[in-house]
């Protein structure tokens, strides 16, 4: 069977949409003060360009290149790009932003510094480009769209094709897509062209009118006119480029700047034996109306377009057809943004192919909607990207528009700065670790998003991380021991560390009989194996029998076994221990409200919960304050109800425990805490055998120094998988970076290269 009619003969259940995607986005760093090209080096926060897989520099030191990992869906690739963009925006200097347009602002060659790369070849290659094309032309930016047809899709098409060699089949299939893409590329230039003008001084001769896409015209970043590479066969394609390299017309194979590039091997000739792996489509201008430079709708519309290239037959006289198509593309690129497609266009053929695909393979209605939008743009150029951008041109310039959009997107990156855009549904500690992973250039894969399970790697070194800090560094049994508060107390007591006295109960009746022994004492009632402060009731004065019974009911909901311990007076502090060292100390203030003289307790809680730092399920630095049984019991002990109005300045606690996870406030006291307590907490974690540990100490007076013989404190709990976000993004205080230190411990070879 011929490749040309392959899809037409495929069954409707073919996994047509199965594909792998990758995006590359170029953007210039701009100085906020003068809106000129930033003159600072590539940010040191972004690790080493020797190996960074996600954030590189393109031609110049100020031109960032954001590169997604391979994604198995179009949604995932855009999410990757959004996260990498988020990291880039928050890693550049605070007085900089990323330019949102393909064409640069006003710029001079003196402002452009070639990227200071350690790779001698790459640096020399950029020097060569400077001499041949000039620095200014290199400042044009865009989006590269990479796509590989899915393995199941390729296998089914191969079986249908009748080919004997899978490599030959792949090569012919991808070459056909490349051929048709070049033949119909002008359609994408019409829809997505977004470089309508050049700022003063960019072009040698000013344009007579605003256009659709300078970047996609002969005025953009293209090879010299003498470079003509045929696409009629893979052998001719390879031989032609090799000839130009050998003759010196091209310095390397990668200097061939086609709108589509065959990818998968370092050298083109390897495609004959190893096969083309995927295609790189290089003709997309940045969409300045989106902070990522491209939208989901564009990605999916282009995907449909590429599949249509597989549906359509290739032209019979290919080389002549591609020459004609190139001229048409240049004409459309240099036409006015509000001008309709020229009469010689064959847009109807492309649209019909898309319609046929949707119908034949029964694609979701979403693709019908995409096609409807495309048809509207064909009829009305105002709806195209350049048509929309045309409205923002002022005094033959887009600089003001670019400045505003660029700064808006930079500010957006700093909104909810504790989160990683696109991954907000994951636990905050995991988001923070992912941010640092991307920033430092460590490869990552989310193995299970709901379970917060990550795979991280650099070269051959692989680490698995769960919930932000559960790693292979901790023995399996250690978290189990810390989850069991009885076991924890026994181990600490055996090692000479102070813990509260108390008793354990497996049933409520037995615990109620214990009341006679504690009825006149302050106590704490808590589940045996809970975390995050769940099910804990604290009585700083003696509890009534009724309140004690309520506390037992609350605790038994969380676990089958309950502890009743003595209440230790003093202030509770959380010490974060990593590999035998205290990295942070937090004073946690129990969930509370402060009266204003006219609001009820219920209203005060609602007001405090409106703080943007508060959220749920560990997705925000602070947690929403609930009004459940525990809070109502605490409120009752203080003599108030939810409908009472608190006097101005009156503080009322709603929880006895001070966990941030139950609505508490976080105050960083790392720098002011006496080092003796930090060391004592670290020693406790070491005694437990924990690599990562949260140590909760009650300290009556921090002015007194601590020692093992005279600790002046009591350990009420050790926590496996301690939260990290509360140490970094605090209610008060400077905050301490934790996730970066976790990565440095896991990948010491990375930190030595940064």
Swiss-Prot record:
Its EC number is 6.3.2.2, 6.3.2.3. Mn(2+) 2 binds at residues 717, 719. Pathway: Sulfur metabolism; glutathione biosynthesis; glutathione from L-cysteine and L-glutamate: step 1/2; Sulfur metabolism; glutathione biosynthesis; glutathione from L-cysteine and L-glutamate: step 2/2. Transmembrane segments: none annotated. Residues 489-752 form the ATP-grasp domain. Signal peptide: none annotated. Mg(2+) 2 binds at residues 717, 719. Its cofactor is Mg(2+); Mn(2+). SUPFAM superfamilies: Glutamine synthetase/guanido kinase, Glutathione synthetase ATP-binding domain-like. One of its GO terms (cellular component) is cytosol. Binds 2 magnesium or manganese ions per subunit. ATP binds at residues 516-574. The keyword Transmembrane does not apply. Synthesizes glutathione from L-glutamate and L-cysteine via gamma-L-glutamyl-L-cysteine. In the N-terminal section; belongs to the glutamate--cysteine ligase type 1 family. Type 2 subfamily. Monomer. This is Glutathione biosynthesis bifunctional protein GshAB. It comes from Streptococcus mutans serotype c (strain ATCC 700610 / UA159). The gene is gshAB.
């Amino acid at each position: 069977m011929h490749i040309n009619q392959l899809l037409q003969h495929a069954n409707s259940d073919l996994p047509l949409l199965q594909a792998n995607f990758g995006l590359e986005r170029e953007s210039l760093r701009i100085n906020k003060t003068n809106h000129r090209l930033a003159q600072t080096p590539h940010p040191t926060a972004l690790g080493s360009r020797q190996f960074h897989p996600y954030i590189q520099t393109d031609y110049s030191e100020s031109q960032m290149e954001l590169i997604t990992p391979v994604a198995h869906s179009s949604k995932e690739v855009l999410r990757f790009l959004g996260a990498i963009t988020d990291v880039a925006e928050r890693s550049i200097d605070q007085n900089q932003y990323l330019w949102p347009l393909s064409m640069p602002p006003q710029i001079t060659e003196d402002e452009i510094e070639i990227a200071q790369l350690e790779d001698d070849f790459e640096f020399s290659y950029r020097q060569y480009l400077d001499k041949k094309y000039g620095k200014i032309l290199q400042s044009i930016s865009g989006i590269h769209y990479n796509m590989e047809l899915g393995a199941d899709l390729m296998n089914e098409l191969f079986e249908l094709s009748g080919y004997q060699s899978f490599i030959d089949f792949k090569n012919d299939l991808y070459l056909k897509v490349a051929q048709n893409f070049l033949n119909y590329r002008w359609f994408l230039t019409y829809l997505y062209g977004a470089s309508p003008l050049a700022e003063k001084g960019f072009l040698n001769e000013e344009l007579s009118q605003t256009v659709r896409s300078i970047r996609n015209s002969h005025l953009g970043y293209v090879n010299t006119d003498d470079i003509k590479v045929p696409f009629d066969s893979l052998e001719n394609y390879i031989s032609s480029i090799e000839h130009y390299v050998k003759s010196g017309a091209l310095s390397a194979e990668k200097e061939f700047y086609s709108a589509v590039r065959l990818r998968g091997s370092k050298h083109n000739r390897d495609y004959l034996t190893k096969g083309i792996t995927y295609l790189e489509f290089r003709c997309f201008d940045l969409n300045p109306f989106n902070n990522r430079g491209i939208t989901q709708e564009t990605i999916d519309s282009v995907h449909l377009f590429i599949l249509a290239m597989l549906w359509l037959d290739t032209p019979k006289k290919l080389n002549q057809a591609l020459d004609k198509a190139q001229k048409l593309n240049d004409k459309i690129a240099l036409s006015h943004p509000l001008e309709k497609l020229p009469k010689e266009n064959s847009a109807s053929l492309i649209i019909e192919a898309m319609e046929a695909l949707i119908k034949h393979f029964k694609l979701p209605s979403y693709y019908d909607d995409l096609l409807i939008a495309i048809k509207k743009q064909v009829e009305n150029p105002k709806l195209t990207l350049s048509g929309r951008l045309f409205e923002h041109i002022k005094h033959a310039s887009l600089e003001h528009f670019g400045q505003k959009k660029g700064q808006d997107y930079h500010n957006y990156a700093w909104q909810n700065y504790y989160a990683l855009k696109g991954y907000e549904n994951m636990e905050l500690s995991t988001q923070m670790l992912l941010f640092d992973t991307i920033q430092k250039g460590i490869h990552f894969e989310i193995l299970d998003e709901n379970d917060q399970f990550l795979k991280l790697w650099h070269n051959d070194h692989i680490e698995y991380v769960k919930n932000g800090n559960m790693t292979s560094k901790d023995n399996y049994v250690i978290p189990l021991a810390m989850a069991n508060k009885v076991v924890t107390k026994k181990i600490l007591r055996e090692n000479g560390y102070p813990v509260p006295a108390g008793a354990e109960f497996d049933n409520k009746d037995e615990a109620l009989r214990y009341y006679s022994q504690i009825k006149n004492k302050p106590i704490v009632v808590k589940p045996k194996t809970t975390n995050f402060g769940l099910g804990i009731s604290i009585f700083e004065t003696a509890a009534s029998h009724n309140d004690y019974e309520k506390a037992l009911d609350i605790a038994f909901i969380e676990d089958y076994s309950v502890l009743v311990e003595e209440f230790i007076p003093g202030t509770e502090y959380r010490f974060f221990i990593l590999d035998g060292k205290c990295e942070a100390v937090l004073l946690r203030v129990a969930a509370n409200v402060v009266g204003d003289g006219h609001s009820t307790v219920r209203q005060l809680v609602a007001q405090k919960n409106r703080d943007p730092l508060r959220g749920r399920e560990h997705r925000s630095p602070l947690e929403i304050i609930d009004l459940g049984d525990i809070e109502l019991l605490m409120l009752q002990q203080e003599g108030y109800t939810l409908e009472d109005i608190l006097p101005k300045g009156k503080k009322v606690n709603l929880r006895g425990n001070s966990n941030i996870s139950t609505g508490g406030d976080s105050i960083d006291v790392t720098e002011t805490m006496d080092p003796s307590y930090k060391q004592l907490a670290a020693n406790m974690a070491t005694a437990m055998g924990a690599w990562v540990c949260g140590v909760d100490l009650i300290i009556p007076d921090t002015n007194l120094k601590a020692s093992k013989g005279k600790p002046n404190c009591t350990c009420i709990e050790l926590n496996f998988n301690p939260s990290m976000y509360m140490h970094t993004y605090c209610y008060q205080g400077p905050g301490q970076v934790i996730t970066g230190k976790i990565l440095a411990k896991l990948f010491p070879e990375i930190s030595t290269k940064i």
